Structure formats: structure tokens, C-alpha cells
Amino acid sequence: MAFYNPHAAGELAARAYLLTFGQLSDVVAQEARRPVGNDLVLEGAVDGRWAAPSHVYETLLHLGEREGLPMFTITSLQNVEPTPPSAAYLRTMLDGLGEAFGWTADERVRYLLRAPGVAPAWTASRLGQLCNGQYRS
């Protein structure tokens, strides 16, 4: 699980999906393990932040606009101690970075090694093996 920290230094590679308000409401509900089908209530915003009905992702955050459309993410703004991600999670991240941005295996590995919690549990060599489908746990 990864969280977006709007106060962190550096750049963040991200992928966006065009959703209706109802679809966004359903994603938030699913992450909170609540029934879908009810639109979010976006009242009481503080600096573009709303409380989300989840114990993990407790904040719906307005990120700005792109091409005139609002961008949102759900995240946790709590101080969370980073832990090493699983091989399956990292493989998904590595594949997504290549697919979305066309990054080489080396670029993807270098990017993930800068992410909190990845190193020292994961080395460039092991991430490279994951990238190339050669990793064996």
C-alpha cells in the first residue's frame, strides 16, 4: 500500500483515470470496505481535503486540475512508518511505470529505490530481476 504525501520533496510518478463523480464515490467506498452506490458528501473541505470514510485512506485530497477537470486522490496524511513492499506489489509498480511512462528497466529501478521503504530490503539487482521476470524469492 502506498500513500501520497503532498508535503514530500521531489517528484511523484502518477497515473490518472477519468472517472465520474459516482465512480470516484464507489472507489472511496470500496477502499473503506463500505457499500457502493452512495455519492460522497463534499462539504466541510479544509484546504482541499475531506475526511474519507476509511481507517486506512482517511483523506480525499484535491490535487488541482488537468485540462479543466478536477483531480483527486485518496490517501493517508498520518505519519506511517514505511515497510518493505512485497515482490508482487513491486512488480505491479515496475510494470505500471514502464507501461505509463515508457521508462527503461533501469529508470524504473532507480525510481523505486528512492521510494521510502524499498531500500535496503530491495536492491537494484533484485528489482532488475523483478523487472525482467527473473526474480525468484
Question: Which role fits each region the language model picked out?
Answer:
Residues 1-137:
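Glycine-aromatic micro-motifs
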